[in-house]
């Protein structure tokens, strides 16, 4: 199985609370410390007092937070919650030829400006171009992955820009990185954000590729993240 990412020197801690959107308090070696959380979602199923957390020592000494949050435990698995790794993980999937829509394309540029947004990837083949936006999905209920777990105006705007790009000759894709081994289906979370859900379905019907791909995270002396499989999309209202 292909390992997409290796993270060295992980530390274990215990979650206490979330003072603000991007900061959590944790116990490390019995002491209360602050850690930076790069996932802006609500993460209610993961941010439970006493839950195990994987951390990495911050590289800069000029921060208020000593650590970066890497992963949190959900039942018997680890869930990556650091969006700083999404671009490299997505690149490994794009370059692996595991997804039909990406075959024949190479990564031309990361962080490509389009309209009012910055899209994660511009891909190119001999005669065609594709814009790819990457979203991390951590909410998995039974075998169903749901995105988003909090309303996302930015996410809706990205999807609308991708749909508009079709009329300018681009191919467009949304790659959802689903952090959960048990997920077998993906659905936009209509209950949480009906505007995003509707925008994604409209974009898909217009020709935007919706590609959910599961990844697993194993932790021992290192953090190993590896892609598993593409899963099916189940649109709101469809029968299981």
UniProtKB/Swiss-Prot annotation:
Gene3D superfamilies: 2.40.50.580, 3.40.1350.60. InterPro entries: SfsA, SfsA_C, SfsA_N. It comes from the Archaea. GO terms for molecular function: DNA binding. Transmembrane segments: none annotated. NCBIfam families: sfsA. Belongs to the SfsA family. This is Sugar fermentation stimulation protein homolog. It comes from Methanothermobacter thermautotrophicus (strain ATCC 29096 / DSM 1053 / JCM 10044 / NBRC 100330 / Delta H) (Methanobacterium thermoautotrophicum).
């Amino acid at each position: 199985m292909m390992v997409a990412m290796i993270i060295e020197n992980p530390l274990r801690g215990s979650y206490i609370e979330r003072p603000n959107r991007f900061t959590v308090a944790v116990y490390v070696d019995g002491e209360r410390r602050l850690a930076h959380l790069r996932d802006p979602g609500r993460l209610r199923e993961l941010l439970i007092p006493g839950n195990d957390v994987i951390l990495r020592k911050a590289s800069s000494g000029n921060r208020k937070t000593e650590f970066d949050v890497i992963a949190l435990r959900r039942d018997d698995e680890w869930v990556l919650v650091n969006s700083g790794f999404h671009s490299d993980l997505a690149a490994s999937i794009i370059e692996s030829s595991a997804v039909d829509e990406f075959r024949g394309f190479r990564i031309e540029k990361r962080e490509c400006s389009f309209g009012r947004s910055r899209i994660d990837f511009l891909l190119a083949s001999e005669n065609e171009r594709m814009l790819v936006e990457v979203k991390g999905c951590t909410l998995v209920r039974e075998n169903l992955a749901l995105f988003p777990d909090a309303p996302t105006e930015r996410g809706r705007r990205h999807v609308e820009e991708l749909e508009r790009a079709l009329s300018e000759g681009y191919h467009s894709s949304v790659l959802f990185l689903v952090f959960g081994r048990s997920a077998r289906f993906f659905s936009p979370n209509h209950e949480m954000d009906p505007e995003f859900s509707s925008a994604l379905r409209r974009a898909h019907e217009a020709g935007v590729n919706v590609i959910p791909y599961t990844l697993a995270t194993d932790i021992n002396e290192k953090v190993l993240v590896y892609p598993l499989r593409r899963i099916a999309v189940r649109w709101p209202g469809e029968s299981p």
